[in-house]
C-alpha cells in the first residue's frame, strides 16, 4: 500500500464534496460485516463521524489507521447522513500507550471526556484538539504513573475552562473574597471553594487542604507542557485526591458519568 503524505492528501482534496482534516479516533461502531463508523475529534470541525469502508477486511487500505487513539490527517467525502473516510495518513499512533494498560485506561478516560463534552464545541475545536493531542502524547511519553495522572488532571481542568465550566479556586463562592486561610471547603454543586466563615452557615462537608488548592491552581494556570515545582513535588496520593474531586465536579455540572472512572480510581489507588 502507498504511504501518502499529509500534503499529498490535501492536494488530492479537489472537489467541493471532499474535505481534509486532522482528527483523533475516539470510538468505533460496527456498521455491517465489512464497515465501521469512527467517531473522531477533528481540528477544524470538532466531533465528526466517518464510515471506514472495508475496515474489517484483511487488506483494508485504512487498516490500523482507524484504531482508537490514533491521530490522522484524513480525506473525507461528504455524504447526506454520514461522511466517508477516503484516505488516512497517521500523524501519531501514541505507540507507547498501546504497550501499557494503565496508559490505555488514562487515555480512554480523556477521550471519553471529549466524547461527552465535545458536542457543539466547533468554535473551540482547534484548541480542544491541540489539548487532547498534547495530553495523549504526554501520557504516552510518561515514565511514572504520577506524571500520567498529572497530564489527566491538567486535561480535566483545561477542558472545563474551555467549555465554560471552570472550577473556582481563588475566591469564596459565597462572599466573593479571596480565600487566604489554610482551611477551606469544596462544593462540587456550587462550583468551587467556600471559606471557613461562610461554611459555618452552608455546612459543606468536603474539606480542601490549601496545598491541594494551590496544586490545582498551578495545573490550571501554567502552560500544559510546563513542568512546575508543583508537578515535581506531587505524589500519587495528591493526584488521586485531585482526580476524584474533578471527576465528581464534572459529573455534577455536565450530567455525564464517565464509564472509565471506576477503573481509573482503582488504578490510582494501587
Language model features with spans:
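Non-catalytic alpha-helical scaffolds and adjoining flexible linkers that form interface surfaces
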Residues: 3-36, 41-270
Amino acid at each position: 500500500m502507498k504511504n501518502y503524505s499529509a500534503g499529498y492528501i490535501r492536494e488530492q482534496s479537489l472537489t467541493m464534496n471532499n474535505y481534509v482534516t486532522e482528527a483523533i479516533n475516539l470510538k468505533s461502531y460496527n456498521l455491517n460485516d465489512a464497515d465501521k463508523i469512527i467517531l473522531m475529534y477533528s481540528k477544524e470541525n470538532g466531533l465528526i463521524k466517518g464510515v471506514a469502508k472495508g475496515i474489517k477486511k484483511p487488506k483494508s487500505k485504512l487498516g490500523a489507521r482507524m484504531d482508537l487513539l490514533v491521530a490522522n490527517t484524513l480525506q473525507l467525502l461528504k455524504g447526506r447522513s454520514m461522511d466517508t473516510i477516503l484516505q488516512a495518513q497517521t500523524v501519531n499512533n501514541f505507540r507507547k500507550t498501546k504497550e501499557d494498560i494503565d496508559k490505555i485506561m488514562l487515555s480512554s478516560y480523556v477521550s471519553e471526556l471529549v466524547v461527552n463534552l465535545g458536542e457543539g464545541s466547533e468554535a473551540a475545536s482547534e484548541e480542544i484538539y491541540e489539548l487532547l493531542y498534547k495530553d495523549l502524547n504526554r501520557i504516552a511519553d510518561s515514565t511514572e504513573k504520577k506524571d500520567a495522572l498529572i497530564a489527566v488532571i491538567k486535561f480535566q481542568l483545561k477542558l472545563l475552562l474551555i467549555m465554560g465550566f471552570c472550577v473556582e479556586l481563588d475566591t469564596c463562592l459565597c462572599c466573593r473574597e479571596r480565600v487566604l486561610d489554610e482551611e477551606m471547603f469544596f462544593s462540587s454543586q456550587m462550583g468551587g471553594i467556600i471559606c471557613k466563615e461562610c461554611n459555618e452557615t452552608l455546612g459543606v462537608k468536603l474539606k480542601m487542604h490549601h496545598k491541594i488548592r494551590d496544586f490545582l491552581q498551578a495545573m490550571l494556570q501554567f502552560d500544559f507542557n510546563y513542568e512546575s515545582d508543583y508537578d515535581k513535588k506531587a505524589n500519587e496520593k495528591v493526584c488521586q485526591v485531585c482526580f476524584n474531586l474533578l471527576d465528581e465536579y464534572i459529573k455534577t455540572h455536565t450530567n455525564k458519568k464517565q464509564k472509565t472512572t471506576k477503573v481509573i480510581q482503582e488504578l490510582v489507588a494501587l
